Design a protein with these regions (language model features):
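A short beta-strand-turn-helix
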Residues: 29-50
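Domain-scale activation on soluble regions of proteins
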Residues: 4-6, 32-34, 160
Length: 187
């Protein structure tokens, strides 16, 4: 991975979702976390990064769970740096709500004893095609992993489940963008 080039999206000031600064912005989505609190994503936390594990069907949550240990390691590594890394799981379901959606979501994620995950897992009923368009995803995409800056702008994204190469690519991007990033050893 070290010899590969890092490809970040080129800002486009004419992009309709750019907000004038040329960056693609993650859509503002409201929903409920696993504690029953209404929250909005993406969080706006300047000088930080946020990984959005975005899922469009409860069945695909099982595959996205493989990202959780990797994201938790990144969160711990960057916790005491000037550019902390946080993460969330976002389940975007097509409205109207169907009875059993929330239990299916919690069952798919497992019984989280972890307050962080209960707080940062969001279920939302939103137009899936709109979210896919905003993320420039294929119209049938089931998942996306999206790296955001502290203002909710998209830095990098990929669609699909966890692979070592995707994880390494994300790690290299974070190390490149965060000048005081913790350096990790690769075995």
């Amino acid at each position: 991975m070290k010899n590969q080039e890092i490809h970040l999206p080129t800002p486009n000031p004419e992009h309709p979702y750019g907000g004038g600064n040329g960056r693609y912005r993650f859509p503002d989505i409201n929903g409920m976390n696993l504690l029953g609190d209404n929250i909005s994503l993406p969080p706006i936390v300047p000088k930080s990064f946020h990984i959005m594990l975005t899922v469009f069907h409860p069945e695909t949550l099982y595959g996205m769970k493989k990202w959780l240990p990797f994201c938790e390691d990144l969160r711990k590594q960057y916790k005491h740096t000037p550019t902390p890394v946080e993460y969330s799981i976002l389940l975007v379901l097509q409205p109207p709500p169907i009875e059993g959606d929330v239990p299916a979501f919690t069952q798919a994620l497992g019984d989280f004893p972890d307050f962080y995950m209960k707080t940062n897992s969001l279920i939302s009923y939103y137009d899936q095609s709109f979210v896919r368009r905003r993320l420039s995803l294929h119209k049938k995409a089931e998942t996306a992993i999206v790296l955001l800056d502290g203002n909710g702008n998209i830095i990098w994204k990929d669609d699909g489940g966890f692979t070592v190469s995707r994880a390494e690519h994300l790690k290299v991007i974070l190390e490149t963008l965060s000048p005081l990033a913790p350096r990790t050893r690769t075995h």
